[in-house]
Amino acid sequence: LNYGEDWSSRLKNARKLSKNELKDLSLEYGNFIGHKLVLFLKGKEKPDLISSHGHTVFHQPEQGITLQIGDLNQIASVSGITTVGDFRSFDVSKGGQGAPLVPIGDEMLFSEYDYCVNLGGISNYSRVVNGERKAKDIAPCNIVSNLLSIKLGAEFDENGEFGRNGKIQKDLLNKLSQWPYYLSGKSLGIENLEDSFIPILDIYSCVVEDKLRTYYEHISQVIGSHLAGKTNKALFTGGGVKNSFLMNCIQKYSDCNIIIPADEVIEFKEAIIFGLLGYLRINNKINVLSSVTGASSDSSSGSIVYA
């Protein structure tokens, strides 16, 4: 789905809106999603349910706050299909981080891999430790490289070519490596990046290509440090997998057997798993694991709007 410049801008700037303006945007966005789904489903078999993550505006679990907009009532009303969403709030109310949510899918659908790594806006992974699924956000990923690429006139760094042509700035690399988040063990949101990570890159004086090259080296070191074992298999998915230069950098810092699956899995693994979350919720089965979120217990999380 191509949002176009208008919706991309409105969602990006949603954090700046007042409470009432945010409510209005959520209603309008839900209506937009509903109509897009109707168009998408023309000529196709009607699904049993819609599972919607929504657009995250705020995620501050330490303060008990997580907000994803895209009104579920609007989606269900316009589409005529039962809709499930708001998967994070209940976990946060139980003292959890409300993230990550994907590990339940890793456990049920991709358990043959020792690590399941996602290179999305933020990189994260899950694995089994002593019989229990564990997961965490690792480091920034595409959010930051996309922002740097925009300064070079592109929406993203295709195949990592901008970074490939840059040089590592050792002082900048050291500054990025000292980012305090890495000691916190908490989930990572755009707020953390805007407040303290992106400014490190912004104030450093060098060409953008050098910033990208240094950034790739940095996140490769951090990601690689989490993946060990020559006999272990690490499944990589998410948009960052298509950045061949970044993948080569990561391989330098990990001795794991890195597995890159078919394009359908790379692009749609999270969508598939969110469909699973909705299925589990509507059947009142556990869909959020406290072992990865830190909540007081596992839960069947999410709001349901029956059409």
Where in the sequence are the language-model features?
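Phosphate/ATP-binding catalytic cores across multiple sugar-kinase/actin-like superfamilies
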Residues: 33-40, 208-232, 281
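Short beta-strand-loop/turn "lid" adjacent to the catalytic site in phosphate-handling enzymes
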Residues: 18-72
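Conserved acidic residues
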Residues: 47-48, 114, 232-234
